Amino acid sequence: MSSFDQTMQFHFSEEPAETNVREVLLTVYGALQEKGYNPINQIVGYLLSGDPAYIPRHKDARALIRKIERDELIEELVKFYLQGQRKD
């Protein structure tokens, strides 16, 4: 069986992030709104491409978001979304 037929596992470190992902995303979201951009489109563009040009320098948003790896941002977004969808 080739390695393409097997499910790969992706592991994150369980150490707390130095930078609060939620605070960074909210700051970036606010900066994008203030500049007149669609924040969701811009953040998705950044997450998919890795191109920091999607994020403005306003309120130091570009520098803030670049301190966090994109996979960490995606992980936090998925966790937040799925936790909100659980019906326990």
Swiss-Prot record:
Stored InterPro entries: IreB (IPR009309)
Pfam families registered for this protein in UniProt: IreB (PF06135)
Domain of life: Bacteria
Similarity comment: family membership: Belongs to the UPF0297 family.
Descriptive protein name: UPF0297 protein GK2555
Biological source species: Geobacillus kaustophilus (strain HTA426)
